Every structure is written in C-alpha cells, then in structure tokens.
C-alpha cells in the first residue's frame, strides 16, 4: 500500500482512532522536522525530530512516525532493539532533553466486519529499561567506531574486509 493511502487514512476525519495523531500534527505550536546537533559521549551527533509538540499532559515530547510491515501492537523491547529504535530513543532524549514517543502505523491495509479499510496504529513510549538498552547499544557502537576510526585506532578497517560470492 502506498504511503499516500496511509496518510489519507490517518488524516481523514472519519478515522476516529487517529484523532490523536491529527491533534499532534495540527498543533499550531508544533515544530516539524526540527534538526539538532550536539556533543554526546565525546562525539558529535545530529538528529532531526519528525515532530516536537505537547502531549495530553502539556509536556513537550518528540514524536517519531514509523511505518512497518509488521503488526505494531506485537512490538516489544526486543523488536525495538532489533531495529535500533531503542538507540534512537536514547539519542533523541539526550539530544533534545525531552521525552520521546514512537507512533507506528502498519503498512498492510485490513478490513473490519463492515468492509472498511484500516491500519494498525500503536503509540510506544520507551521505558527506562528500553532507554538503558539504547544507551548500551550506542556505547557499543562508539567502542567499535573508536577501534577503527578513533585517534587511537587499534584496528584497520581494510583488514576486516571480506569478499564472498554466495
């Protein structure tokens, strides 16, 4: 299904379950595609938040929209880890200094009992456990980066090159 079809479904006034997404997007104070650059753990990082807005409690929050071929309501902390979303959540929380939420929208259209098309939608707020796992993954990545590219590099990236035909 085309992303335009999903966007049209989300933005339709007839789609009650996505009213909260429309409210976030239509907030006149929301900042869209907000870039940032910062230093974190001795390295420069850049990011671009899809949306910075206020949530239902009035707190500023970063919203990142994702489409997925899986069923978003089946996601768990291991799914977030396998796609690196925990690292993204950790980095954005550190870079922007505010909470973070993902809104996942399934790509596969489904039909309800009346034949009406819908998509799975799931809002995920990373737990402290997930953020901690993200921090661990970021630190592991920085360790690898330092090993091959840092000032005191101990490995040559060209020596780890493998070429195969499978």
Stretches found by the model and what they are:
Residues 47-75, 92:
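Conserved catalytic cores of phosphodiester-cleaving nucleases, focusing on short active-site segments
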Residues 44-46, 60, 119-121:
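Short, mixed charged/polar active-site loops
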Residues 37-39, 71-80:
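Surface-exposed cleft-lining segments at the edges of enzyme active sites
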Residues 41, 56-59, 111-114:
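Short, solvent-exposed loop/turn segments that connect beta-strands within catalytic domains
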Residues 79-86, 91-166:
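Metal-dependent nuclease catalytic regions and adjoining charged, substrate-binding loops involved
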Residues 23-28, 53-60, 94-100:
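Secondary-structure boundary elements
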């Amino acid at each position: 299904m085309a992303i335009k079809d999903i966007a049209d479904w989300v933005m339709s006034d007839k789609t009650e379950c996505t009213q909260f997404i429309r409210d976030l997007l239509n907030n006149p104070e929301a900042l869209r595609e907000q870039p940032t650059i910062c230093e974190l753990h001795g390295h420069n990082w850049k990011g671009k938040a899809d949306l910075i807005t206020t949530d239902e409690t009035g707190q500023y929050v970063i919203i990142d929209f994702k489409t997925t071929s899986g069923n978003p309501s089946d996601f768990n902390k291991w799914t977030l880890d396998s796609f690196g979303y925990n690292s993204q959540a950790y980095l954005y929380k550190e870079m922007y200094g505010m909470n973070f939420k993902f809104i996942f929208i399934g790509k596969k259209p489904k039909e309800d009992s009346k034949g009406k098309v819908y998509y799975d939608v799931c809002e995920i707020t990373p737990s402290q456990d997930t953020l901690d796992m993200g921090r661990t993954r970021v630190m592991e990545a920085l360790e690898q980066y330092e090993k091959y590219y840092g000032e005191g590099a101990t490995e040559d990236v060209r020596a780890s090159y493998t070429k195969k035909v499978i």
